[in-house]
């Protein structure tokens, strides 16, 4: 069985993440999909980064009744920086009988040649590229082992937009997998943004 690895900050998870995960397990060879939250992304604003445990718990609650999905907290156990190749090596040692596919958005595919050891990633693991608004992928030029999933759903919601809207007091109950999590996220964001003493 092919196991898809969905990396990201999930800051917070939203319905777009779940719609994509559902599509990939129903319309591609992926039988299981593991969410791999990143403790820290050096390219993103850490001031609004929700606590790692909270992000993982929100994902776990959202997927708790779906056996196709699970959360992997492996990156908190690995040294920084959290390069994808290091995480995949660790997973391959922990789960030697699994076949892994790396799921990446078309936006990340555009800069994939700048990823650490990207040639090794492509040589050892399947890459499944999903569409993102504003980014085109020419699947006729993709290397062997890479595939572009044209029909995967694109829901134009971002975690950044969710955080901003929650801080503005907007009602986002239909954007989040768990409507009741909005208050928890709002409280955590206020803590993140309050001056540290």
Curated annotation (Swiss-Prot):
<keyword id="KW-0520">NAD</keyword>
<keyword id="KW-0808">Transferase</keyword>
<keyword id="KW-0547">Nucleotide-binding</keyword>
<dbReference type="InterPro" id="IPR005248">
    <property type="entry name" value="NadD/NMNAT"/>
</dbReference>
<dbReference type="GO" id="GO:0009435">
    <property type="term" value="P:NAD biosynthetic process"/>
</dbReference>
<keyword id="KW-0662">Pyridine nucleotide biosynthesis</keyword>
<comment type="function">
    <text>Catalyzes the reversible adenylation of nicotinate mononucleotide (NaMN) to nicotinic acid adenine dinucleotide (NaAD).</text>
</comment>
<keyword id="KW-0067">ATP-binding</keyword>
<keyword id="KW-0548">Nucleotidyltransferase</keyword>
<comment type="pathway">
    <text>Cofactor biosynthesis; NAD(+) biosynthesis; deamido-NAD(+) from nicotinate D-ribonucleotide: step 1/1.</text>
</comment>
<dbReference type="Pfam" id="PF01467">
    <property type="entry name" value="CTP_transf_like"/>
</dbReference>
<dbReference type="GO" id="GO:0005524">
    <property type="term" value="F:ATP binding"/>
</dbReference>
<dbReference type="GO" id="GO:0004515">
    <property type="term" value="F:nicotinate-nucleotide adenylyltransferase activity"/>
</dbReference>
<protein>
    <recommendedName>
        <fullName>Probable nicotinate-nucleotide adenylyltransferase</fullName>
        <ecNumber>2.7.7.18</ecNumber>
    </recommendedName>
</protein>
<comment type="similarity">
    <text>Belongs to the NadD family.</text>
</comment>
<dbReference type="InterPro" id="IPR014729">
    <property type="entry name" value="Rossmann-like_a/b/a_fold"/>
</dbReference>
<dbReference type="InterPro" id="IPR004821">
    <property type="entry name" value="Cyt_trans-like"/>
</dbReference>
């Amino acid at each position: 069985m092919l196991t898809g690895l969905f990396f990201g900050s999930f800051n917070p998870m939203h319905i777009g993440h779940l719609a994509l995960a559902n599509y990939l397990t129903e319309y591609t060879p992926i039988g299981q999909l593991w969410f791999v939250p990143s403790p820290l992304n050096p390219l993103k604003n850490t001031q609004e980064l929700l606590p790692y445990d909270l992000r993982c718990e929100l994902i776990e609650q959202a997927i708790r009744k779906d056996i196709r999905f699970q959360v992997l907290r492996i990156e908190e156990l690995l040294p920084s920086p959290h390069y994808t190749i290091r995480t995949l090596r660790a997973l391959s040692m922990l789960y030697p009988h699994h076949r892994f596919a790396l799921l990446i958005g078309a936006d990340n595919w555009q800069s994939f040649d700048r990823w650490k050891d990207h040639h090794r990633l492509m040589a050892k693991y399947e890459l499944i590229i999903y569409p993102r608004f504003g980014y085109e992928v020419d699947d006729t030029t993709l290397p062997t082992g890479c595939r572009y999933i044209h029909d995967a759903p694109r829901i134009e919601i971002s975690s950044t937009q969710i955080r901003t809207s929650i801080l503005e007091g907007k009602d986002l109950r239909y954007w989040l997998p768990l409507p009741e999590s909005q208050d928890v996220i709002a409280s955590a964001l206020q803590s993140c943004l309050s001056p540290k003493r």
